Amino acid sequence: QTVKEIFDAEKIDMIFNADTIKAYKNDDNTITVTTTKDGDNVTGTHLLLAIGRVPNTDLLGLENTSIEKNNRGFINVNEYCQTNVEGIYAMGDCNGKGAFTHTSYNDYQIVENQLFGEKNRKISDRITTYGLFIDPPLGRVGMTKTEAISNGHKILVAHRPMDKVGRAKEKGETFGFMEAIINAENNQFLGACV
């Protein structure tokens, strides 16, 4: 919803659940796309095609092993980044657990802990994070308010509109807010978003 509000303010239209029938460039350098959504034509100056990510696991020679992949081509791993073949681990983008540098590094930490440590780290212990590199950028770490409440936490919420943040005012980017969610019983940090 937040991304839609940002795009609406920029006069960027989003079309959901539609397949492209055809796309062509017009004489005035605009692009027209015909979609299955009511057969509508959409004309604009730019076209963003977001098709998702595909791992390059087909280049690893896995067909010569018994290592299993899922239907999207990611290598199947358990909570410890172990494949179905004993002693073989899959870390980073190839396991489908998050295509981020910090996630890949955490995969390494889990495997290192399994091989040389206390064997007590696992993927499910990972704190949920994400970032959307749009303008303004969006990001989250940990639980949302809804998740915290549904997990039985009594929460405190610190909320600060961006129009009250000096740096945001200085840059003229005052849309949105920052928020932190804290466990009201023990002051434990549960999550934050911007």
Set out the residue ranges of the language-model regions.
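FAD-site-proximal beta/loop scaffold in flavoenzymes
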Residues: 41-117
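Conserved beta-strand segments of alpha/beta enzyme cores
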Residues: 13-14, 41, 68, 154-156
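Short loop/edge segments at beta-strand edges and connector loops
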Residues: 16-18, 71, 159
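Mid-to-C-terminal Rossmann-like scaffold of FAD/NAD(P)H-dependent oxidoreductases
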Residues: 9, 21-22, 56, 94-194
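A short, glycine/Asx- and small/polar-enriched loop/turn
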Residues: 25-31, 85, 171-176
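Conserved beta-strand-loop-beta-strand element in the redox core of flavoprotein oxidoreductases
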Residues: 24-41, 47
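Short acidic-glycine loop/turn motifs at beta-strand connectors
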Residues: 27, 37, 63-64, 71, ...
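Helical element adjacent to the flavin cofactor pocket in flavoenzyme catalytic cores
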Residues: 2-14
